[in-house]
A protein has these predicted regions:
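Alpha-helical segments flanking ligand/cofactor-binding loops in enzyme cores
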Residues: 21-22, 85, 123, 158
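Conserved N-terminal subdomain of the carbohydrate kinase-like
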Residues: 2-5, 25-100, 104-107, 111
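Conserved phosphate/ATP/ADP-binding segment of small-molecule kinases
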Residues: 115-171
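Aromatic/hydrophobic pocket-lining residues that form π-stacking "cages" and hydrophobic walls in ligand
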Residues: 20, 87, 172
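Conserved active-site and cofactor/substrate-binding residues in soluble primary-metabolism enzymes
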Residues: 12-19, 52-59, 68, 78-82, ...
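Glycine/serine-rich anion-binding loops at beta->alpha junctions
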Residues: 3-25
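Active-site glycine-centered loops adjacent to acidic/histidine catalytic or metal-binding residues
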Residues: 8, 101, 135
């Protein structure tokens, strides 16, 4: 089985494609990667983000898709609208499971998606999702609604599904 991780590179391997590769390996799955951005971070500090160009993103896609049968995709950090739209053009025709793990902020506080790209994320990436797995913070950002006794996680998950995801699982 071949799974493709699309996301950012975390040099500490605590998140991003490096973390996905570790998980895939544990499950005896062949992991493939497309890097959307390179981050400078570790377990305590966030430095910066350098997104890849549209050309290198497309080149990575063509290299993978021309050589491997992809059985599933996990999308993490997408960072900006150019990356989102390029991915959408490549992914929209595929008929394979896509897991979307929205990546908005690092655990050390760094922003991992441009605020201006959140609308495009909702328009182009969420509808591709077989399942989307936001945490509480990400779900609240995507829906612009605070989770509370009135707006339960179940209600917020339904709001996200109405954006196009087949399933939504919020981890609190």
């Amino acid at each position: 089985m071949n799974l493709l991780s699309i996301g950012g590179s975390d040099p500490s391997s605590g998140a991003g494609i490096q973390s996905d590769i570790k998980t895939f390996s544990t499950l005896d799955v062949h992991g493939l990667t497309i890097i959307t951005a390179i981050t400078g971070q570790n377990t305590t500090n966030f430095g910066m983000v350098e997104p890849v160009s549209k050309e290198i993103l497309q080149n990575q896609w063509e290299a993978i898709i021309s050589d491997f049968k992809i059985d599933g995709i996990k999308i993490g950090m997408v960072y900006n609208s150019q990356i989102i739209k390029t991915l959408y053009q490549n992914l929209k025709k595929l008929k394979i499971p896509i897991i979307v793990d929205p990546v908005i902020k690092s655990t050390t506080g760094g922003m991992l998606i441009k605020e201006s790209a959140i609308t495009d994320f909702k328009k182009f990436i969420i509808p591709l999702a077989t399942i989307i797995t936001p945490n509480r913070f990400e779900a609240e950002i995507l829906t612009k609604t605070k989770i509370n006794s009135k707006n339960t996680p179940e209600k917020i998950a339904k709001m996200i599904q109405r954006m196009g995801a087949k399933l939504s699982l919020i981890h609190i």
